[in-house]
Amino acid sequence: IKSGDDADSEAEANLKAARDLIGEAIRLAKPRADELIYCVIGAPAEASIHNREAIIEAAREHVDSVMLCSEPFAVAYGLDWLEDVLVVDIGAGTTDLCRMHGTMPEETDQVMFDIAGDAVDAELAKQIEATCKGAQFTVQMIKDIKERYGYVGDAPERVVVELPVDGKPTSFDLTDQLQAACSVLIEPILDGLKRLIATFDPEFQARLKERVLLAGGGSMVKGLDTAVEKAMNERLGGGKVIRIEEPIYGGSNGALKIAHDMPEDYWEQLK
């Protein structure tokens, strides 16, 4: 379920997909028939009330109680980094930023924008169409190239990929195209960081800048942590960016910890 309100038919299809996904995840966990099922679901930081209700509705037939939390909050909670931390969670459809300062984050502590993994894919496809005459590819091929070779900054090595041209595998150097595509992430991240730092307590802004966590699948782009840190030093007067050890599972690890720790008042009873 992405941000924004979809047309009714697409919204219903998305709801069914989310419902089926939750059901399959629970089936794989093999709960006993007498066990109550509690589910923590990560949502984009600025997900609308409509979309939050849709997520709860998707969970209704499978779980007894549900809790929604912002995805970057789940990352920070799982790492026990809850004081003066900025989390940048780069997913497929959205990049979510969350400012942690010892309490549950409020709306003003969070920023979301829709330049994320899908935007990198779209830019890479555009770059290939413009520079690789006759090259044929699919969305999945683009994702695979990005996930294997994506980088910003100095190229670790030349990236040469085979794509079919009129049925014949043909080698293309995509080094520059990959850098251009992956670089679309940097400016929005910097804008979000600047907004959350500038509106924080001035006494602790310097500490906040030194504790920026990169998470999510998009954080695996090679050199992204270094590039964001360099941009922070140039435009914000300093900064330290750390890529978390488990960028793919950081949010789910945090959600599991939240499920164990949160009292009953925080849960929404569905049954």
Language-model segments: which ranges?
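Nucleotide/phosphate-binding catalytic cleft detector across ATP-hydrolyzing
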Residues: 1-90, 100-190, 194-212, 219-250, ...
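Short acidic, Gly/Ser-rich segments with clustered Asp/Glu that frequently serve as metal-coordination loops
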Residues: 93-94
